[in-house]
Design a protein with these regions (language model features):
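Signature of long, low-cysteine stretches enriched in small and polar/charged residues
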Residues: 92-137
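Primarily a LysM-type cell-wall glycan-binding module
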Residues: 170-201, 223
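Extracellular LysM carbohydrate-binding repeats and other cell-envelope/extracellular binding modules
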Residues: 201-229
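Pan-zinc metallopeptidase signature
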Residues: 1-45, 169-173
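Short, hydrophobic/aromatic-rich segments at coil-to-beta transitions
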Residues: 33-39, 62-63, 107-116
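Surface-exposed amphipathic alpha-helical segments
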Residues: 54, 140-178
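Short, well-ordered beta-strand elements
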Residues: 75-78, 134-146
Length: 229
């Protein structure tokens, strides 16, 4: 009876894996795709890179980069450009705060303005980028209202300065991640599979969750599991 029950469970598991084979994992191409620490958006034609160990949330209205323990965050939003002006002029219309350490520059070949902004007792790292009649606004601050912004500004700048058009070789990275069946080989572990996985932010935990092995379940050789490609 135990043998029959085990065979039945294995059969049900394999049927389930067949049904979910090829299902989308995470975001759609329309929303943009997160792979490892990269964000790729086909329609907007942009790529951004997150600092190591930062989480990235892709919401309907913005992309949010979050530092460990939520101590800082940088939000990226997009709007249509309706006036003929510079990024600096655009920001000056939006805020009456004080800007300093400012500069006009090119980011990924596009007109941009980079500054620190002090407004309503909060210090923020702000960048405005004009690209193809769209305005990309980067707004970074900290849990302490920017009083400790120096601790995170290098990471804010690394995100902002990673902004550029997609390369031809990156177009395939805008395709959504898919769930695939995988037969566990000798020597496999969740740790080794996570190193090869495109899942962004803590792929080992997410693979464990996907397979019901969170937090510390082990893999069995020849077992079929779900991975993401």
């Amino acid at each position: 009876a135990d043998s029959l029950r085990k065979d039945s469970l294995e059969s049900n598991s394999q049927n389930y894996l067949k049904r979910i084979e090829g299902m989308t994992y995470g975001d759609s191409q329309v929303a943009g795709i997160l792979r490892k620490n990269g964000f790729y958006h086909k329609d907007l034609d942009i790529r951004l890179i997150s600092p190591d160990n930062w989480e990235v949330l892709n919401t309907p209205n913005s992309l949010i980069f979050i530092a460990p323990e939520g101590k800082a965050s940088l939000q990226v939003s997009v709007s249509d450009q309706v006036r003929k002006e510079t990024p600096k002029n655009y920001l000056s219309r939006l805020t009456s705060g004080e800007v300093y350490q400012s500069k006009e520059l090119k980011l990924g070949g596009h007109q941009a303005f980079l500054t620190l902004l002090e407004e309503n007792f909060r210090i923020s790292r702000v960048a405005i980028v004009f690209k193809n009649k769209r305005i990309f606004t980067f707004y970074g601050t900290t849990e302490k209202n920017g009083l400790d912004i120096g601790e995170f500004d290098n990471q804010f700048l690394s995100i902002i300065e990673s902004f550029r058009d997609l390369k031809a070789t990156e177009i395939e990275l805008t395709e959504p991640l898919l769930i695939k069946s995988y037969k566990v080989a000798r020597g496999d572990s969740y740790s080794s599979l996570a190193r090869k996985s495109p899942i962004p932010f803590d792929p080992e935990s997410r693979l464990r969750l996907l397979n019901g092995d969170y937090p510390d379940g082990d893999l069995e050789v020849d077992a079929w599991i779900k991975i993401v490609e």
